[in-house]
């Protein structure tokens, strides 16, 4: 089996230590802690952590697990429980069941949960009037934004800081385009689980309620 590298994106706001400790416990309980190299990366944007993974992939033949402290900006809000449950559901797959995920990496470039195809904003956005004639798209991605991949795929991707150039003002921020960074090259991706009923959609449409310290 290839070496395993786990990159944990940790935005150090609110009670970040609680989530980090939770995720490290998942890793240890799964047995991954005994065999994987763990990289804890701090930053206010995921592309900083992705950049470190991307650089690492050029000189290492490895499997990579990407984790993030999902829900950190919802702590102390009415959506804290909703986003916490979502994070734990995701961890229950990619970490607790890690052996199944990596078993598919010989055949696939990336493995994750809750796959979403490319979609037109006009087909789902609440502001129908604004986007009714628009060709703006949301890229294909794993909605969980925690996934497994391998160095042979990562090294083919564009520098994540360069990839953000594809963002346009109509996206409302670069996060939309960045969610598709992992899947921006190739078509060989594997979804293992899909339960979008667990996705905290209500929180996502109320971004103004996030708890982000000034």
Predicted regions and their residues:
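ER/Golgi luminal nucleotide-sugar-dependent glycosyltransferases, focusing on the catalytic module
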Residues: 1-214
